[in-house]
Amino acid sequence: LHRVDRRQRQMCIRDSSRTVFPSDEFYLIAKRELPPYEFYEDFPQIENGVGMLRDLEEEFSWAVEDEPERDIKRRVTIPTGEGVYAFMEHVMDFAREKFPGLEINLVPVHNDFFGGTVNVTGLLTGRDLVNRLSRENLGDAILLAPSMLMADEDIFLDDMTVQQLSEKLGVPAYRMHKDAAGELKDILGTAE
């Protein structure tokens, strides 16, 4: 990251743009705080995981701010990769603070399928989720990040379906929306 920082300064002088951006994972591994939202300019590499977390934080906080206050009595479980667990706890706190009756049980899931060094949410499998979530009070629903599932199907990388996951754990499971406002509505139970 120090080398990239130095290179970015050079590029900014020459091109008025950082041009080179390390993925969010680099910051998580180095236990460094993610750069501020503005650092990512117009998010030219977000599909590659560059700025994705900071963008989610910003968008989710705006969605919470825009959502009208109301009494929510709901407990949801959201499994996540071990690598982003702490950051996601911080992001979920926006909703917890505004809706005190809302319980968000964020659960870090170890990736047994690909091995423990793989700690991203998008590579978790149905079996990994069953193994970890079977020890939890899951509440009203399990909410799944879209990155865990095949593009247009509710199937995990190990061919388990979301329906099979629900049946094994005895709680309905749903794919969350991709956008922050939709995710918040999924969490609140107000999604259409």
Model-assigned labels for residue ranges:
Residues 30-192:
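Radical SAM enzyme core and accessory elements
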Residues 2-4, 18, 152:
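Generic secretory/membrane-interface signal
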Residues 2-5, 24, 140:
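Acidic side chains
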Residues 15-17, 101:
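Short secondary-structure junction motifs
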Residues 17-30:
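A glycine-rich phosphate-binding loop feature that marks nucleotide/adenosyl-phosphate handling sites
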Residues 1-13:
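Single conserved hydrophobic/aromatic residue that forms the stacking wall/gate
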